[in-house]
Amino acid sequence: MPQSPDREDPEIHGGTREISVKITPFTTTPTPFSLRLVQGPGSPRNFTLAREEVVLGRSSEADIQVDSTDLSRKHIALRREHGQYTVHDLDSRNGIYLNGVKIHSAVLHEGDNLQLGSVVLVYHEGRE
């Protein structure tokens, strides 16, 4: 089927064709690092990790307070180091279990489960 004169086939006639492409930059919405309380008093609940160090415990002096007798007043510290959070036991009575393994400190990864006595939290990594 013959083409109209204004739509030449560049393969046959050696012509060129101009095209216009709109490029939209890809941007992501920042999401904060967070802990989700999935088991324990007040669950379900989300806590944003907005500072370089966040202390979690049952005391009103803790940055994140969870009212459970299984928690020490200052049970754990979450520290942001090199763009990721680490969890540290603050000499708590019941310790920390990370994905079922007792630890003293560790780097956290997306979806990690932290168990502090009967309290269970899930860690979610943020995007900047």
Regions found by a protein language model. Name each.
Residues 1-67, 79:
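Intrinsically disordered, low-complexity acidic Ser/Thr-rich regulatory segments
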Residues 43-120:
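Forkhead-associated
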Residues 121-128:
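Short, Lys/Arg- and Gly-enriched loop/turn segments at beta-strand edges
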